[in-house]
Swiss-Prot record:
UniProt organism field: Neosartorya fischeri (strain ATCC 1020 / DSM 3700 / CBS 544.65 / FGSC A1164 / JCM 1740 / NRRL 181 / WB 181)
Main localization category: cytoplasm
Pfam families attached to this UniProt entry: ATG17_like
Listed name of the protein: Autophagy-related protein 17
Location of this chain's protein in the cell: Cytoplasm; Preautophagosomal structure membrane
Annotated family: Belongs to the ATG17 family.
Keywords: Autophagy, Coiled coil, Cytoplasm, Membrane
Recorded GO MF terms: molecular adaptor activity; protein kinase activator activity
Cellular component GO terms, alphabetical: Atg1/ULK1 kinase complex; phagophore assembly site membrane
Protein function: Autophagy-specific protein that functions in response to autophagy-inducing signals as a scaffold to recruit other ATG proteins to organize pre-autophagosomal structure (PAS) formation. Modulates the timing and magnitude of the autophagy response, such as the size of the sequestering vesicles. Plays particularly a role in pexophagy and nucleophagy.
Coiled-coil intervals: 317-354, 427-451
Length: 550
């Protein structure tokens, strides 16, 4: 709009009557000027937009300052949180490794225990299934198995001790699992909080990206504030331009007031129209800020105008009136743009607030976790490790005891088979002895008969010629040989020692250790008569054990 203004006339009313008719006819009608004055007054309501523009600039500046502070705080907290989260997940990984390692070792030990117990039970079952041959036991006794000669109280006590160790380890493992599950719940809640944080960061970044020419801001964890200074500068430029546009509207209004007042009958109309001016609208260039200033401007005396000056003022007024509506629309467009920019600024501020709140929530959660519950999770892992080390030693000892018992009972089975083979061997030796005795008896009897016959022949042929006292034994019969069975002494160290060990024993020790043979009442050693197949089976089992051992 034009900024030219006409000087005021000293007197009101229409121009002089002596003017030429053509100029008088060119003068505008008062109602036309009044309509322009009313429109100009209406356009001054745009001052509300200017005030709003100032508020927007102030709010945007405050939001930018807050964003700088909040972003700095968030960045500081986030760097600390990253370190704490890495440490927290390292602790969780270590605790989980302790649990998995202990579980694996415990499972391996349990498998070894199961295998050893299975072997022991299988051996005990073989003892139950192996019936002692009746030939070994007194006549009339109920059948017995090898298991009847075993005291299982040691096995039961060992099982009870192992069960106690297993139960204690299982309880410690269950407590560790419960602790780890609670730890996982803590991590899950932290993940949820991190999800809230990421959502807020993504939203803020998307808004920042939409207002920027590049999308680099959307790739960062915190929204970029690089666009906010430019937006604030844009708001300031809009506000300044709106103030300039409002100033042009005020000048146009002043021009309308002056034109109406210089028109005959327009003074009262101008005063009536300008009686309720918006507060703060400057009139007649005096920048009045209240109604009293406006009234003073309206009551001020007018400077006289010539017809040409008046006509020039009216021409400027008409020209500006045609542009006033566009100026008002431009102010409205600018305030709409400023509102949109402010909304974007406040949205980024709110997003940063959300990120900061989410960050502080995570920080408080981590602080609470680190000061109260995390030491308990770590202590539970140490407790499990201590319990497992203690019980692992006990279980390893019990495993060795199970193996020893199994070896003992397996040796019992092997010894019983060896006993059967030994009985068969002794039976065979007895048979050989009997054969030797039979052969010897036959030869002795034969010699005896021959000797008796020879003595009788000698007595018949020579006896009558020899005096009886020449040899008293001449008429005696041959001696007779009798075999007597004597029970053997117990096989003691003397009989079992090696030759060089026997030589080291003194005569007294040898006399003490060697038990004298005891004559049995029945004169014979009882050797059980075992079936051939029983002996063969025992011998086959012994061979299988020897082969399996090699």
């Amino acid at each position: 709009m034009s900024s030219s203004e006409s000087s005021s006339a000293s007197g009101g009313g229409r121009p002089d009557a002596g003017q030429p008719p053509s100029e008088e006819q060119a003068m505008p009608r008062l109602d036309t000027l009044i309509s322009h004055l009313v429109a100009a007054k209406r356009s001054l309501s745009s001052i509300n937009h200017v005030w709003r523009a100032n508020e927007i600039v102030t709010a945007a500046r405050a939001a930018l300052e807050e964003c700088v502070v909040v972003s700095a705080r968030t960045g500081f907290l986030r760097r600390g949180l990253n370190n704490q989260l890495r440490l927290l997940y390292s602790v969780r990984t270590e605790v989980e490794e302790i649990s998995l390692r202990g579980r694996s070792e415990f499972a391996a030990v349990l498998k070894d225990l199961d295998d050893a117990d299975t072997r022991l039970r299988r051996t005990l079952e073989l003892l139950r299934e192996t019936i002692v041959h009746p030939a070994f036991r007194p006549e009339g006794e109920d059948p017995k198995s090898l298991h009847d000669f075993v005291d299982e109280r040691g096995v039961e006590e060992l099982h009870a001790a192992l069960k106690s160790s297993i139960d204690r380890t299982t309880a410690a493992q269950a407590q560790l699992d419960s602790s780890n599950h609670a730890f996982d719940d803590e991590l899950l809640s932290i993940k949820e909080a991190l999800g809230t944080y990421r959502t807020a960061a993504k939203l803020a970044s998307s808004r920042s990206s939409s207002s920027a020419s590049s999308s680099s801001a959307s790739n960062s964890s915190l929204p970029s504030m690089s666009t906010m200074p430019s937006m604030l500068h844009s708001l300031e430029m809009h506000a300044q331009e709106m103030a300039n546009l409002l100033e042009s509207l005020v000048r146009h209004f002043d021009l309308c007031v002056t034109a109406v007042k210089h028109t005959e009958g327009g003074g009262a109309a101008a005063k009536s129209i300008t009686g309720d001016m918006p507060v703060g609208v400057p009139v007649s260039g005096r920048m009045g800020s209240n109604i009293e200033d406006i009234n003073d401007n309206l009551n001020a005396p007018l400077d006289p105008l010539s017809n040409s000056e008046y006509q020039e003022m009216v021409n400027v007024l008409f020209k500006d009136a045609a542009e006033a509506e566009d100026v008002v629309m431009e102010i409205q467009d600018r305030i709409s743009e400023m509102e949109s920019v402010l909304e974007n600024v406040l949205a980024q501020r709110d997003a940063l607030r959300s990120i900061y709140n989410a960050t502080t929530d995570i920080y408080q959660h981590l602080s609470s976790l680190g000061s109260t519950r995390l030491p308990g999770y770590i202590a539970q892992a140490h407790n499990f490790t201590q319990v497992w080390h203690e019980e692992n030693d006990r279980i390893s000892g019990g495993l060795a005891d199970l193996s020893d018992l199994n070896s003992l009972y397996d040796g019992f089975l092997d010894a019983y088979d060896g006993l059967i083979v030994e009985v068969a061997r002794r039976k065979h030796v007895r048979q050989r002895v009997e054969k030797v005795l039979r052969d010897a008896r036959h030869k002795l009897d034969q010699l005896y008969e021959e000797d008796v016959t020879a003595r009788e022949t000698f007595r018949v042929e020579k006896g009558d010629y020899l005096p009886s006292d020449i040899w008293p034994e001449i008429g005696r019969e041959p001696m007779r040989i009798e075999f007597r069975r004597i029970s053997g002494a117990n096989v003691q160290a003397v009989n079992l020692q090696r030759p060089h060990e026997q030589e080291a024993i003194t005569g007294e020790q040898e006399a003490a250790n060697r038990l004298a043979p005891v004559e049995s009442s029945d004169g014979d050693e009882i050797i059980p008569d075992l079936p051939r197949d029983l002996v063969e089976q025992a011998f086959a089992r012994l061979k299988a054990r020897v082969k399996g051992a090699t």
